Amino acid sequence: MQKPTSSILNVIMDGGDSVGGGGGDDHHRHLHHHHRPTFPFQLLGKHDPDDNHQQQPSPSSSSSLFSLHQHQQLSQSQPQSQSQKSQPQTTQKELLQTQEESAVVAAKKPPLKRASTKDRHTKVDGRGRRIRMPALCAARVFQLTRELGHKSDGETIEWLLQQAEPSVIAATGTGTIPANFTSLNISLRSSGSSMSLPSHFRSAASTFSPNNIFSPAMLQQQQQQQRGGGVGFHHPHLQGRAPTSSLFPGIDNFTPTTSFLNFHNPTKQEGDQDSEELNSEKKRRIQTTSDLHQQQQQHQHDQIGGYTLQSSNSGSTATAAAAQQIPGNFWMVAAAAAAGGGGGNNNQTGGLMTASIGTGGGGGEPVWTFPSINTAAAALYRSGVSGVPSGAVSSGLHFMNFAAPMAFLTGQQQLATTSNHEINEDSNNNEGGRSDGGGDHHNTQRHHHHQQQHHHNILSGLNQYGRQVSGDSQASGSLGGGDEEDQQD
């Protein structure tokens, strides 16, 4: 760029010289070259004020300078225009590049992290363990959740497990508590488990109904009873007979009786005593079987619903046969005869009943009680007849006072008539040898009539045939009196 500029300046300088002629001009030009050796650079620098005063440019030089300046502006404007044309293209490319880069950065940007990185899901049997069930089963669970008003389906399934806990225990014997439940950090909100949980677990919120005997306390009590030597059974738990078949074999075949429920709820020691007495009773029963067979031919024997009635014609107390039932039958044995010897008679009936207690001079009053049972049914009943000494009790039968009304089976009339016949029979045997005149006969008749009324009052409280029994007893009394008159004649 300097070479063209210098040539143009030289041309301009030559033109200036040709325009201004004369010797003075040459001398002035000589001086000018002497003072300004580098004329082209003078145009670019500043002019001194002395030079401006000394030399004034001509119009031709000013026009040449203007053309030079215009040429420089044109040469500078061309690359500027080219740069301005290329600038929009570069800006568009830069915008596209920035957009692409922003899209790539947005794609590579990681998602926002949670506040806590802890896994809130509990791992049960591995991380990928899930439950798959049929669609119908799932629909039923959802419907049950809506009907019960539960917050989640898991709560409904938990409720179903609670309801099925007895069946699960009966089928598996262990329940639904997993083997690794100690390692699981779970809180059983309302679990119906029958197993004891660690202290850091919450206790079961729901309890079983009283009819369900599979509660933890009941199972523990049953285990202690089994270790102690036997399983104690009490009648309040009869409501749960169906689920107890596995724990108590044979309980379905057991039929509780009134005597069992009222009189047999003893303690453990009393139960042991009763078992020993029953064993001794069985031995005595075997020994007296042959004797009973012979005595049955001589005595009237009527057995109604397990209650044995027997007369005392032989003059001694006969042992009553035990019915094959649960212990607790009522033993009714005739009193001792009046023709006793010097010593007292202690009569026992298989260890269950305490018979007559007597001192010197014959048999005493019969005492009826139950061993080791403190109930109202053990009240004593002593037969005392006015006009008859204590050593000569001629009563045929003695009944106990019962705490609860006892319903006889079929044949109540037969029981009443049989007892009355036995009373008359016993009185005839005892009083037949001692009747000397009509006065004794009337006294004996009055005594038997009074005793019959006494027994009729007891029977009327036990059954609904009191009136019929009373009529039959009066008839039997009249028959007994006729027989006695025949014997006296």
Curated annotation (Swiss-Prot):
Residues 54-101 have a biased composition (Low complexity). Residues 116-125, 433-443 have a biased composition (Basic and acidic residues). One of its GO terms (cellular component) is nucleus. Induction: Induced during seed imbibition. Circadian-regulation with the lowest expression in the middle of the dark period. Residues 444-457 have a biased composition (Basic residues). Its main location: nucleus. GO terms for molecular function: DNA-binding transcription factor activity; sequence-specific DNA binding; transcription cis-regulatory region binding. It is found in: Nucleus. The keyword Zinc-finger does not apply. Residues 1-125, 257-314, 422-489 are annotated as: Disordered. Expressed in the vascular tissues of the embryo. Expressed in young proliferating tissues. Residues 117-171 form the TCP domain. Residues 257-268, 422-432, 460-477 have a biased composition (Polar residues). Disulfide bonds: none annotated. InterPro entries: TF_TCP_subgr, Transcription_factor_TCP. The keyword Repressor applies. It holds the Pfam family TCP. Ubiquitinated. Targeted for degradation by the SCF(COI1) E3 ubiquitin ligase-proteasome pathway during jasmonate signaling in response to Pseudomonas syringae infection and the secreted type III effector HopBB1. Keywords: Activator, Developmental protein, DNA-binding, Nucleus, Repressor, Transcription, Transcription regulation, Ubl conjugation. Interacts with DOF3.2. Interacts with SPY. Interacts with SRFR1. Interacts with GAI and RGL2. Interacts with DA1, DAR1 and DAR2. Interacts with the Pseudomonas syringae type III effector HopBB1. Interacts with SCE1. Interacts with MOS1. Associates with OR in the nucleus; this leads to the repression of its transactivation activity to inhibit chloroplast biogenesis in etiolated seedlings. Plants overexpressing TCP14 exhibit altered plant development and occasionally are lethal. Plants overexpressing TCP14 are modestly reduced in size and exhibit enhanced resistance to the bacterial pathogen Pseudomonas syringae pv tomato strain DC3000, and the oomycete Hyaloperonospora arabidopsidis. This is Transcription factor TCP14. It comes from Arabidopsis thaliana (Mouse-ear cress). The lineage of its organism: Eukaryota, Viridiplantae, Streptophyta, Embryophyta, Tracheophyta.
